[in-house]
């Protein structure tokens, strides 16, 4: 029976006693201990004799466990062989505590090192995210006036070009595909915004007056000598300056994208076909007609048109940069000769003296958003003034659209009158003071107090000077994966500019028409002294590339907007911003809704074809003289909300497209 008990205990406990298991699992040998020869295992019967009956109480068992010599932690293993167990003078648990303390110190060092390393890696990754170059091709959008130019901008982004690279290529493309609106012989303005750094730069490459141009010459002969209308082109200098600041791909490669469009040919757009059929310049030369009407009649939309002459010019500029355009080379000589032959006074020195300006945009806060727009001689301050005035009205979804339209019409009358007082601040110091007043919320509240809720003003609140601007303009909007926003508007002034075409294929602008002089218009409106003609001066401009971002932080709505139509464009931008930022409409709906524009010279409120008869009747009941027209302006846009980016064209345009990378 005793043998059976012993066998059952051994099968239950195995080869080791509970004390042996404790010594193996709880107290490993310290690394510095010398290994000792393994001691032979005692017989189970001898241990049981010492421990006594296994059914004894736990306290007795634990006491006996403390008397067990722990072979795995002893340095005198050899002396224990064959010896009976004896009480130890040293508590093995005290030794274990010391050993654990030693191991905890080592663990602390390891954990500290790991945390330090992890923190360093995290900081490096955060810095890379915010300040490093993008590592993958993410979302983006491009919007232009022609589908092939939008596709070209997208292609540049796909080849890891910057947002500005894409904008430059697309703008040059529009100079080929939309020669009635833009080109190398014109000028414009580009607004670039860095989202991560919250920094903005405006590159002004508006045309300037030749040094020998005088107001008297324009008064006598502006309508018979088209050479007098040509300003020094700024397009090449401006795009090159933008690329120097923000470009990623080589300049020559960016220009090669556009040169391929000119060389391979493009499909004539609806807008170009209409311009060639209805808006040919009266002085169109044989060279002009051979270039744009090669078959002797206006081309149909979709017809293939090639411009190998412009492809060659772009190749030259890609190799030599703007020097080939401005520093007395063959291109410069051709432009000067063409202008002088048509009665103009431009010289080679005018080209060498020209420079693009890099400056800060004007800005205002509207409904928690920062609105950025070009400073004078552009009319960005008047746009912000309109928003400041409207901000004080209770414009919500609860207010009827008809009432909101009345407030907008009266507000735009004030804003456009303010715009007519602007000009080039380099030549008139009072313009800076006028700009400050336009940006003031206090002044806006004062103007708002003069607006009746129920009746249109019978006469303008402010003196109105001559307002005439480029009716045609080309737009490029880019939001790229590099977290940059680019908005650009360029122009030749009226369709095909001056109509003067150089042997190299450069179509020259007519921007001197944007200056003000006596008896300039049929209605004999008063000329603006601030916008009078002076050598080297830049005329008043309604080219208004506009960027919107959250006033605080990074999260929220970002917008890039552009418009054509001169003063009508300012009215259109105001209403689109109102729809998006105040009425919380999506961008597509905001661009599609009907728009109005007050013509200050005739005191007529123009509305587009989207207006209903009920809306027109409401406005007429308030005292507005309403005239319905098909289209007032095109406003294109791109919107970014968090990480979602979309590009949207104005639905009134048959040719413009917006493309997005999803």
Curated annotation (Swiss-Prot):
GO terms for molecular function: glutathione hydrolase activity; leukotriene C4 gamma-glutamyl transferase activity. One of its GO terms (biological process) is glutathione biosynthetic process. Cleaved by autocatalysis into a large and a small subunit and the autocatalytic cleavage is essential to the functional activation of the enzyme. Residues 1-106 are cytoplasmic. Pathway: Sulfur metabolism; glutathione metabolism. Its EC number is 3.4.19.13, 2.3.2.2. It comes from the Eukaryota. The modification Phosphoserine is found at residues 17, 72, 79, 83. Residues 72-83 have a biased composition (Low complexity). The chain crosses the membrane at residues 107-127. It catalyses: an N-terminal (5-L-glutamyl)-[peptide] + an alpha-amino acid = 5-L-glutamyl amino acid + an N-terminal L-alpha-aminoacyl-[peptide]; glutathione + H2O = L-cysteinylglycine + L-glutamate; an S-substituted glutathione + H2O = an S-substituted L-cysteinylglycine + L-glutamate. The keyword rRNA-binding does not apply. Residues 26-90 are annotated as: Disordered. Glycans are attached at residues 198, 267, 283, 330, 353, 394, 519, 523, 586. Belongs to the gamma-glutamyltransferase family. Heterodimer composed of the light and heavy chains. The active site is located in the light chain. Hydrolyzes and transfers gamma-glutamyl moieties from glutathione and other gamma-glutamyl compounds to acceptors. This is Glutathione hydrolase 7. The gene is Ggt7.
């Amino acid at each position: 029976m005793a043998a059976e008990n012993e066998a059952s205990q051994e099968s239950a406990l195995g080869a080791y006693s509970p004390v042996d298991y404790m010594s193996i699992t709880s107290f490993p040998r310290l690394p510095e201990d010398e290994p000792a020869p393994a001691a032979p295992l005692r017989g189970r019967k001898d241990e049981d004799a010492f421990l006594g009956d296994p059914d004894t109480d736990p306290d007795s068992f634990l006491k006996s466990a403390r008397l067990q010599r722990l072979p795995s932690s002893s340095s005198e293993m050899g002396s224990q062989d064959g010896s009976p167990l004896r009480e130890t003078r040293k508590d093995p648990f005290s030794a274990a505590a010391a050993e654990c303390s030693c191991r905890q110190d080592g663990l602390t060092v390891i954990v500290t090192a790991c945390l330090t390393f992890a923190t360093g890696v995290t900081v490096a990754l955060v810095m890379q995210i915010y300040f490093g170059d993008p590592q993958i091709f993410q979302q983006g959008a491009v919007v232009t006036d022609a589908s092939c130019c939008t596709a070209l901008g997208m292609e540049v982004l796909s080849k890891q070009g910057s947002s500005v690279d894409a904008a430059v290529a697309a703008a040059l493309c529009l100079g080929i595909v939309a020669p009635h609106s833009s080109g190398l012989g014109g000028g414009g303005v580009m607004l670039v915004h860095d989202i991560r750094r919250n920094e903005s730069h405006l590159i002004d490459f508006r045309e300037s007056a030749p040094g020998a141009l005088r107001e008297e010459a324009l008064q006598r002969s502006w309508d018979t000598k088209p050479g007098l209308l040509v300003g020094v082109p700024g397009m090449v200098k401006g795009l090159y300056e933008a690329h120097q600041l923000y470009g990623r791909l080589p300049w020559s490669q960016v220009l090669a994208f556009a040169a391929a469009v000119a060389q391979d040919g493009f499909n004539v757009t609806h807008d170009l076909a209409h311009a060639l059929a209805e808006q040919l310049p009266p002085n169109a030369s044989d060279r002009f007609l051979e270039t744009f009407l090669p078959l002797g009649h206006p081309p149909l939309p979709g017809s293939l048109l090639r411009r190998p002459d412009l492809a060659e010019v772009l190749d030259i500029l890609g190799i030599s940069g703007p020097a080939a355009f401005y520093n007395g080379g063959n291109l410069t000589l051709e432009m000067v000769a063409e202008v002088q032959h048509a009665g103009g006074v431009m010289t080679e020195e005018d080209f060498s003296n020209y420079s693009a300006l890099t400056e800060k945009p004007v800005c205002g806060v509207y409904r928690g958003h920062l609105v950025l727009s070009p400073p004078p001689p552009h009319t960005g301050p008047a746009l912000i003034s309109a928003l400041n005035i409207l901000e004080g009205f209770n414009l919500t979804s609860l207010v009827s659209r008809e009432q909101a339209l009345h407030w907008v019409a009266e507000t735009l009358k004030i804003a456009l009158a303010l715009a007519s007082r602007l000009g080039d601040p380099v030549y008139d110091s009072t313009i800076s003071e006028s700009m400050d007043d336009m940006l003031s919320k206090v002044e806006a509240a004062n103007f708002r107090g003069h607006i009746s809720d129920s009746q249109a003003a019978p006469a303008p609140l402010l003196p109105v000077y001559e307002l005439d601007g480029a009716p045609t303009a080309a737009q490029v909007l880019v939001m790229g994966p590099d977290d940059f926003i680019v908005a650009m508007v360029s122009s030749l002034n009226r369709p095909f500019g001056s109509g003067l075409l150089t042997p190299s294929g450069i179509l020259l602008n007519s921007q001197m028409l944007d200056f003000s002089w006596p008896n300039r218009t049929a209605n004999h409106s008063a000329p603006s002294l601030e916008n009078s003609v002076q050598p080297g001066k830049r005329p008043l401009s309604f080219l208004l590339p506009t960027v919107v971002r959250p006033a605080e932080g990074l999260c929220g709505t970002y917008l890039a907007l552009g418009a054509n139509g001169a003063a009508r464009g300012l009215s259109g931008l105001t209403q689109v911003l109102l729809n998006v930022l105040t009425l919380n409409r999506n961008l597509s709906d905001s661009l599609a809704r009907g728009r109005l524009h007050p013509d200050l010279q005739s005191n007529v409120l123009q509305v587009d074809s989207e207006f209903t008869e009920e809306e027109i009747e409401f406005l007429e009941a308030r005292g507005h003289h309403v005239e319905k027209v098909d289209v007032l302006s095109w406003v294109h846009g791109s919107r970014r909300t968090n990480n979602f980016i979309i590009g949207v064209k104005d639905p009134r345009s048959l040719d413009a497209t917006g493309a997005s990378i999803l």
